[in-house]
Amino acid sequence: MPNLRQMEIVTDVDKLNVDLQATLMKYRTIKQWAYIVHDKDDTRAHYHIYLNFGTSSVNTALVASWFQIPENFINKVKGRKTDMLLYLTHGNDSQRNKHQYDTKEVIANFDFETEITNASIIGDRKSVV
């Protein structure tokens, strides 16, 4: 039950039994969020949900209760925020062999495309999505 400032939720679409949009907007502790449905991979349709709590740390068990999912569906974000955001579209170099999702498929409470473009400009990425 760690406390984290940012985390990722990965869950099959049919396992998420809450209104995702309403849940994301309900908790003001979540400063930034972005999600996508990966439904063109070679696996079952699943969500990748990015959560950022700003300067606060939030317990993963609490977040699991918000989304009514097991806590083990929540992962610590490894690497930089940009790496996590790029993974949503399989934009990382290591994900080039997977389906490339359009940035317009990502739903976020911030300008996702600008965030990715700015990361490219400052050198976090070799090419723009």
Indicate residue ranges for each PLM-predicted region.
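The conserved glycine-aromatic submotif of the RRM
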Residues: 41-48
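A broad, low-specificity signal marking well-ordered, structured residues that form hydrophobic/aromatic
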Residues: 7, 33-34, 47, 72
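Catalytic "initiation/cleavage/transfer" segments centered on a nucleophilic residue
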Residues: 1-27, 54-129
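Short, glycine- and small/hydrophobic-rich beta-strand elements in well-ordered beta-sheets
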Residues: 29-41
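Extracellular, beta-strand-rich glycan-interacting domains
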Residues: 50-52
